[in-house]
């Protein structure tokens, strides 16, 4: 049987690279598009080192409509598309909103505008579309408030675009995966979260501070109405998140019905505070990190964690890696880089 061919945009990034490995392990053929703005070509070599297979790779920016059109004229035989390519910092999006609106929305528009309509489409969305939810845990039917950041708003707009596009394309099927907070690294220690610039996410900030790459480490706000005063998030191990994409693809490929549009939360169902993450890192690493406390950061919600019962029921997916193991894998990756 011929392997299904999956296009992974942003496939050398953090989530994209782990998902690429999961796809290859499941027997899919993979093609990656990445502009290397927040990733490295070295990841491609490491994917081959882990899987013994080198996926097809094309370097260009999906916001370039002309290049996208040229690419898809020559390469339009994909069975599925997983779209990761996007800017992803909440804090940076508050400072550079137009960069985020242009990059994240334009790169999406240039995909369904060019690909075959008979395709299974997985979109990398975010729990930021919920804003500050009034009730926890967050379900897929939780009302979407105005997101707290331009980043979150771009994800919300992209969801709307895909929903509208799916309505008019009778053969297009779409799954939206609303991630909570990915953490951890591949068990090989060969790939993990490795931002080109100063990290924006909590765990790589912690690991880079612990190893000496960062000289300062700050917690933004310890006066939130939470159990210890710091923000609470649902931290999803990266290997579980990668598997969620496989489950979503298999759900679409096995479904006899065309023109599906469905949304799933991808988290663990449990929230951890910033202080609890630091404590867990200290426990698995043997460190005793000291940090500064600074004022609250604009764009941060107080608390967010998922209800994942829908993904369990329909996708037959659930998180399996423990929080401590995910934190330890991130630390092992930091030391192996």
Language model segments and positions:
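Short-chain dehydrogenase/reductase
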Residues: 101, 148-156, 192-200, 204, ...
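Active-site Tyr-X1-5-Lys
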Residues: 148-183, 204-212
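N-terminal Rossmann/SDR dinucleotide-binding element
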Residues: 2-80, 198
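Conserved Rossmann-fold NAD(P)-dependent oxidoreductase catalytic core, especially the SDR/UDP-sugar
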Residues: 83, 109-150, 168, 175
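NAD(P)-cofactor binding segment of oxidoreductase domains
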Residues: 95-122, 160
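Short alpha-helical oligomerization interface
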Residues: 90-106, 139-147
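Flexible, glycine-rich beta-alpha linker
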Residues: 130-131, 149-150, 172-199, 226-227
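C-terminal substrate-binding subdomain of Rossmann-fold SDR/epimerase-dehydratase oxidoreductases
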Residues: 205, 211-337
């Amino acid at each position: 049987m011929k392997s299904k061919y999956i296009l992974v945009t942003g496939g050398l990034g953090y989530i994209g690279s782990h998902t690429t490995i999961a796809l290859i392990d499941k027997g899919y053929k993979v093609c990656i598009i990445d502009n290397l703005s927040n990733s490295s070509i070295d990841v491609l070599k490491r994917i081959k080192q882990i899987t013994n297979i080198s996926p097809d790779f094309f370097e260009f920016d999906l916001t370039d409509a002309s290049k996208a059109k040229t690419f898809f004229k020559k390469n339009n035989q994909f069975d599925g598309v997983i779209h990761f390519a996007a800017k992803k910092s909440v804090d940076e999006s508050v400072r550079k909103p137009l960069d985020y609106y242009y990059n994240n929305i334009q790169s999406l528009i240039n995909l369904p505008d060019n690909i075959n309509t008979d395709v299974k489409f997985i979109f990398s969305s975010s729990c930021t579309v919920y804003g500050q939810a009034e009730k926890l845990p967050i379900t897929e039917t939780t009302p979407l408030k105005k997101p707290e950041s331009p980043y979150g708003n771009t994800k919300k707009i992209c969801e709307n675009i895909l929903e509208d596009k799916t309505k008019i394309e009778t053969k297009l099927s779409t799954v939206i995966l609303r991630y909570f907070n990915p953490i951890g690294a591949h068990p090989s220690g060969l790939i993990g979260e490795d931002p080109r610039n100063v990290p924006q996410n909590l765990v790589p900030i912690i690991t880079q501070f612990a190893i000496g790459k960062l000289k300062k480490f700050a917690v933004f706000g310890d006066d939130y109405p939470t159990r210890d005063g710091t923000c609470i998030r649902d931290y999803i191990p990266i290997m579980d998140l990668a598997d969620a994409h496989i489950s979503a693809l298999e759900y679409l490929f096995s479904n006899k019905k065309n023109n599906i549009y469905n949304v799933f939360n991808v988290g663990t169902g449990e929230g951890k505070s910033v202080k609890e993450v630091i404590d867990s890192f200290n426990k698995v690493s043997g460190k005793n990190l000291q940090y500064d406390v600074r004022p609250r950061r604009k764009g941060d919600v107080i608390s967010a964690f998922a209800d994942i019962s829908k993904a369990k029921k329909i996708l037959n997916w659930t998180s399996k890696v423990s929080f401590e193991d995910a934190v330890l894998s991130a630390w092992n990756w930091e030391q192996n880089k």
